[in-house]
Regions:
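Compositionally biased, intrinsically disordered low-complexity segments enriched in Pro/Arg/Gln/His
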Residues: 20, 24-25
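Alpha-helical substrate-recognition element adjacent to the catalytic core
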Residues: 51-254, 329-330, 334
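Acidic, Mg2+-coordinating phosphoryl-transfer loop and its flanking beta/alpha structural elements
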Residues: 220-223, 290-340
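C-terminal functional extensions of proteins
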Residues: 332-355
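Active-site-proximal segments of catalytic enzyme domains
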Residues: 241-283
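N-terminal mitochondrial targeting presequences
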Residues: 39-41
Length: 355
């Protein structure tokens, strides 16, 4: 989108933000010599999709959202942005501040990892265990029953977060009790991961490599199982020293058998920096008030709670299913929403601009 140099178009007080993708009528504004602008609307899409001023000759123009245009976000069919002006300002601030001011906070399952591959659902951390031949049949049966009962509650747009939390705690506690009954050994986890179909989202390895190169702290929050998550990171060779995992970790007995879980329960609605108790990690965050937050659920929006203020938090959300039902809520919560995107292309594009 472009406007004449020095002009800011508000269109009668309306902010020119739009849901991206899809044609719309083109609006032109003619500026007569006496100055009052006259609007003309064409009935179909223009070649450029731009809103432009005309006054006899084509004026010199500048982009209204230059950074978003560089990123290719203004015409991408899978991208939704509710407030273009705010996101332009956020991204521009992150880019101009550079890597030294940046930290990244990311969910893991279906954010750093793929949802599906060639039409088949990929394993999450829980799914790796659920689908492993090393687990007894009764575990898979019971785990599937719990999934069928509680997952619809997790994603129900008609329920508030406060209403969902008790059910999520019930779900996690029951799964954890099942795991303890199975007497899972620590040494079996590597085999579970290597035999699973878990895959990183395309471009995740490149993103992790670049963030490690520039020493950017990466905090991975997961309501899954931390021991399995760490095995996945090792398996794909992305578990670098700038990355910290906050999740539910197993407690083992002397023989390496799971007998419980360490610390407080992490579920999808209490993931935030207040859950971190490592002073060493917070030392790394000094002066890093710019955040790129990546998540696939509405609960992930709060992961940056606890970041020192003032801060600039760019929230990028992956909307993987039930798009029509959940799109409005995702656009309200995330700055950029990516629909059925199995890549890290948008995130990598932002990071490349910072170089």
């Amino acid at each position: 989108m472009i406007v004449s140099r020095g002009a800011v178009l508000r269109a009668g007080g309306r902010q020119l933000s739009r849901v991206l993708g899809g044609a719309r009528p083109t609006e032109h504004i003619t500026e007569p010599s006496k100055g009052s602008a006259i609007r003309h609307k064409s009935s179909g899409p223009s070649d450029s999709g731009f809103c432009q001023f005309t006054a006899g000759i084509m004026p010199e123009t500048v982009p209204m959202y230059p950074t978003l245009e560089k990123l290719g976000l203004l015409n991408a069919a899978h991208v939704r942005i509710k407030d273009l002006a705010r996101v332009e300002e956020l991204v521009s601030s992150l880019v101009s501040s550079g890597f030294s001011k940046l930290q990244v906070i990311a969910d893991f399952d279906r954010t750093m990892t793929r949802v599906s591959y060639f039409g088949k659902l990929c394993d999450t951390c829980h799914g790796i265990m659920d689908n492993s031949s090393l687990m007894p049949a009764f575990y898979r049966e019971e785990a599937n029953k719990l999934l069928a009962k509680y997952y619809p509650i997790e994603i129900d747009p008609k329920m508030s977060e406060e209403e969902k939390i008790p059910y999520m705690i019930e779900w996690y506690n029951q799964i954890h009790e099942l795991i303890i009954k199975c007497k899972v050994s620590q040494k079996s986890l590597e085999e579970m991961v290597s035999s699973s179909n878990a895959r990183l989202r395309d471009g995740t390895r490149d993103l992790c490599k670049k963030l490690h190169e520039y020493g950017v702290p990466v905090l991975v929050f997961s309501a899954g199982m931390g021991d399995i998550l760490e095995q996945v990171l090792r398996h794909f060779d992305v578990y670098t020293d700038n990355l910290k995992v906050v999740s539910n970790f197993f407690k083992y007995d002397e023989e390496g058998i799971v007998v419980g879980f360490e610390g407080d329960l992490i579920h999808m609605f209490n993931k935030n920096e207040n859950a971190i108790h490592s002073s060493d990690y917070f030392d790394k965050l000094t002066g890093r008030n710019n955040v790129i937050l990546l998540g696939d659920s509405l609960g992930d929006i709060k992961m940056a709670v606890g970041v020192p203020q003032p801060s600039n938090v760019l929230k990028i959300g992956f909307l993987n299913d039930k798009v029509e039902e959940r799109l409005e809520a995702y656009m309200d919560g995330f700055d950029i929403v990516l629909i059925d995107d199995q890549t890290m292309d948008v995130v990598n594009s932002v990071v490349r601009l910072m170089e």
